[in-house]
Swiss-Prot record:
Enzyme Commission number: 2.1.1.57
MF annotations from Gene Ontology: mRNA (nucleoside-2'-O-)-methyltransferase activity; nucleic acid binding
Residue ranges of domain RrmJ-type SAM-dependent 2'-O-MTase in the record: 223-442
Protein name per its UniProtKB record: Cap-specific mRNA (nucleoside-2'-O-)-methyltransferase 1
Predominant localisation class: nucleus
Localization in the cell: Nucleus
Binding site for substrate: K195, T196, V197, F198, D199, R210, N366, L367, Q368, N431
Positions of S-adenosyl-L-methionine binding: N226, C269, A270, G271, P272, G273, G274, F275, D327, I328
Keywords linked to the UniProt accession: Methyltransferase, mRNA capping, mRNA processing, Nucleus, S-adenosyl-L-methionine, Transferase
Organism: Danio rerio (Zebrafish)
Entry keyword Nucleotide-binding: no
Region Disordered, annotated ranges: 1-68
Length: 829
């Protein structure tokens, strides 16, 4: 769940209805989606509203003609002739009671006004009359939304000294009704009055009316974890997919699927993780998420990501890493999260950050803005700490009436190219929720970040005192920026008016349970279609048998190639390597296996021998996205030497077949390696030392084989009895005991590669047609099955000399000098 452990959408029986002011996130499990939902305890008067009206009594019954008698008769005018005849048979006469002596009740028994679980006779003061707000002129519901941006900011970002002078300390304030600098007094007071009306109303009664009154209500969470995912889908579309498909200032896409870096994003204060589930559903293994939220009941629920691969998301909880508390208001947690993100993104930062924090303010709903001020500040501070220049930020806010809140918005306005305050249709209109959307972080914002950090230190210092930070930007500076000031007032008053109408509408729907929004189903379909979201139900992912899943993924093609074993390289077949440019080579460290992932820790391996028997990967802690098929080795990695040496089993990827459902077998070998490197980077979790690592093998060109021998050393291992053994050190300073060299043909017959001495360029040559071309011919690409079945393996066994310190040499076996001299002979630039 979110940081808001008890947001307004939670089905808490005793919660007051005014909690429309808190987040409307996690109610879908307790609510029905029918448009005419009504309580089982509806009053009789509500039921009567569905009956046909009764006709007046006949003229013969009005023969006395007295005014008093007419008034009495009018009491029964609502009943038809049949009803009156039945009463007449029982001896009923107007003005008299039933019974032998007319001793029965003379007045009509009034219909019950009891609703829900109210106490008998309880009359809710706010629901005895109208609110005198015309809500019926609201605009027609539509899936089309418009974005209004702040004017582009012209002021320069102040330096640290000037910013420090902006902070104003004063007496802590716990009232909102006098905050009229950024909203008209009449609108603010009317809004507070409309909220207060619901204070004594039972929560369930309010929720039923809200469900019927909101035309967008049945969109809910679709097939995602919760409604937050659909809010993100909604806003991603409205803002032209600037989050899931970011572009530079020239409109060039920054993160393509086949090439380019991962889409790095962050999600803070956002358990259980609906925002992230949407992003990962949209981009899958081409994205990597980092999250920080409160541990415990409000934590991320990654196991409930049914629509997207949660294995691509790494939760981090600030100081202490996975053992931290995730409290974003602690300065040390923000600093730790910043360092972790920068380390994980090669110092570049995130493409965008999402923040959706909130917490329960039960009983103090009107003060939500004031009570949430530090949370809002820390989310803004985190954005400036982890978002890269040009990156984006999206954060939930509530009312923005106080100078403190507006000052924070002004600081964002200075730091980003464009800023908007936006309320998506997936956010219920009766609450004060809206989102600040920031596009294009400007360079040189460190001074503002440090200023926000200082403000947070002050707020922590004042937490238990009557002092507080009341302004972060002087009011005269805000008012002096006319464009910003006018936009702020217009935005506040616009959303205030929308909220007032929505509250009045709910008030009317509480009073009349027959009212409902007839277009809910149509609007839902329109929105899902516009946002590109399939209209399907949320279902638990099905479990699969590994053997059946394997056949499903490979589609029965080239099955024999899986059983092929590598050809041993020797002096006889060394001639196969005469077209040197056709080959790549990889250092082996164990038996080649096929690895199949069915999601999270459901991982199986097969040695490639017939018949196929998939075995669960035991004694491994690793999580991989479902529908993934790789060619791998299980290698024991070593770090250090002697008694201090540490060992860990790792998965080393040789090649990729299917990546989270994406079949890459027909891609060029180099392309497959690039894609699986991207995939491995997305699933790796450096913050989890308890998990076994997964790495992609380093690939060398055959003509550059000598680079491999530079990485070979003789090292002492614990199991070697003090004798040095041949070791290969990888890119991450971990080494392993090499078993030999895989040599992989990446050019498909009849094509080969050669080097043109005249043009000093490599070109492709067709041995059958004699065609030559510098461009890569599609038919020259060797798919996986060709690479796999035509591979050679040069075993570095006893008697094979590949390191200068090795003294035992078998002249019948290929040594380093033999292979290197052969390569030099056939490759001359």
């Amino acid at each position: 769940m979110k940081r808001a452990a008890q947001a307004s959408d939670e089905p808490l029986k005793k919660r007051k209805t005014a909690r429309e002011e808190s987040s409307d996130e996690d109610e879908e499990s307790s609510q029905r989606t029918t448009s005419q939902d009504s309580s089982q305890s509806e009053s009789l008067s509500d039921v009567e509203d569905h009956k046909p009206s009764f006709s007046r009594p006949s003229d013969s019954q009005n023969s006395q003609g007295s005014m008093a008698h007419n008034e009495a008769s009018n009491k029964f005018a609502m009943y038809n002739n049949v009803s009156q005849k039945l009463m007449a048979k029982m001896g009923f006469r107007e003005g008299e009671g039933l019974g032998k002596y007319g001793q029965g009740r003379k007045e009509i028994v009034e219909a019950s006004t009891q609703r829900g679980r109210r106490g008998l006779g309880l009359m809710l003061k706010g629901f005895q009359g109208d609110l005198n707000v015309d809500w019926e002129d609201e605009p027609e519901p539509s899936a089309i939304e418009q974005v209004s941006w702040f004017p582009e900011s012209s002021p320069e970002i102040p330096d640290s000294d000037e910013l420090r002078d902006w902070m104003t300390i004063g007496e802590k304030k716990l009232k909102i009704d006098d905050e009229i600098e950024f909203c008209s007094e009449n609108l603010l007071h009317l809004l507070l009055r409309c909220k207060t009306v619901f204070d004594d109303l039972e929560g369930e009664e309010m929720r039923r009316a809200r469900t019927r009154s909101n035309p967008y209500e049945t969109i809910r969470g679709a097939f995602f974890l919760n409604r937050a995912a659909m809010k993100m889908a909604n806003m991603d579309h409205v803002f032209d997919y600037m989050f899931t498909n970011p572009k530079d200032s020239q409109g060039k896409v920054l993160t393509r699927d086949k090439e380019g870096e991962l889409l790095y994003f962050g999600d803070v204060c956002a358990g259980p993780g609906g925002f992230s589930e949407y992003v990962l559903w949209r981009r899958r293994w081409h994205a990597k998420g980092f999250g920080m939220t409160l541990k415990g009941a409000n934590d991320f629920k990654l196991e409930d990501f049914y629509a997207a691969p949660s294995e691509l998301f790494e939760a981090y909880y600030g100081e202490g890493g996975i053992d931290g508390d995730g409290d974003i208001t602690r300065p040390e947690n923000i600093s730790a999260f910043r360092n972790f993100v920068l380390d994980s993104t090669e110092g570049r930062g995130l493409h965008f950050l999402m923040a959706d924090g909130g917490f329960s303010v039960e009983g103090q709903e009107n003060l939500q803005e004031i009570l949430s001020k530090q949370l809002l500040l820390c989310q803004f501070l985190t954005a400036l700490s982890v978002v890269r220049p040009g990156g984006h930020f999206l954060c939930k806010t509530f009312d923005l009436f106080t100078p403190f809140s507006v000052g924070l918005i002004y600081l964002l306005y200075l730091c980003f190219e464009r800023v908007s305050l936006f309320k998506p249709v997936t956010s219920r209109p009766a609450n004060s929720e809206r989102y600040v959307v920031c596009k294009g972080l400007k360079p040189g914002t460190d001074a503002v970040r440090e200023y926000m950090f200082t403000i947070n230190l002050k707020l922590n210092q004042f937490r238990h005192s009557d002092r507080d930070v009341i302004e972060v930007v002087p009011l005269d500076i805000i008012k002096g920026d006319t464009d910003f000031f006018q936009y702020m007032i217009g935005s506040n008053e616009s959303y205030c008016a929308v909220q007032i109408k929505a509250l009045a509408k709910i008030h009317a729907y509480v009073r009349d349970t027959t009212l409902f929004e007839a277009r809910q189903a149509d609007i839902r379909k329109e929105c899902l279609k516009l946002w590109g979201i399939p209209d399907k139900a949320r279902v638990t992912p099905s479990t699969s048998d590994p053997k059946n899943k394997f056949y499903e993924l490979v589609k029965g093609s080239e099955m024999d190639s899986f059983n092929s074993r590598p050809t041993a390289l020797n002096s006889v077949n060394l001639e196969k390597l005469q077209h040197v440019l056709d080959y790549r080579c990889i250092v082996g460290g164990g038996e080649q296996l096929f690895l199949l992932a069915l999601g999270r820790s459901q991982i199986y391996t097969w040695d490639g021998k017939a018949p196929s028997r998939w075995k669960k990967l035991e004694n491994f802690k690793m999580e991989l996205p479902r529908d993934t098929l790789l060619s791998v080795e299980i290698v024991q990695e070593l770090k250090g030497e002697g008694k201090a040496q540490r060992r860990i089993n790792a998965v080393h990827v040789l090649d990729a077949l299917v990546l989270n459902g994406t079949d890459v077998r027909d891609q060029h070998f180099n392309q497959r390696i690039q894609m699986v490197e991207k995939f491995v980077k997305a699933v790796s979790k450096p913050s989890r030392p308890d998990m076994n690592p997964i790495r992609v093998k380093e690939v060398y060109r055959l003509e550059e084989m000598e680079k491999i021998f530079v990485r070979l050393e003789m090292k002492i291992t614990k199991s070697s009895g003090g004798m040095p053994r041949l070791s290969y050190t990888g890119r991450d300073d971990r080494h392993f005991l090499p078993t030999g060299l895989y040599i992989i043909k990446t050019v498909n017959d009849p094509w080969t590669m050669a080097f043109s001495k005249s043009s000093k360029r490599k070109f492709f040559y067709n041995k059958q047609t004699k065609e030559s071309t510098y461009d890569l011919p599609a038919t020259s690409v060797a798919p996986f099955y060709v690479c796999h079945q035509d591979r050679l393996f040069w075993a570095w066994e006893e008697g094979v000399r590949v390191h200068d310190s090795q003294t035992r040499i078998n002249p019948d076996k290929l040594s380093k000098d033999d292979v290197v001299s052969f390569i030099h002979k056939h490759y001359q630039q």
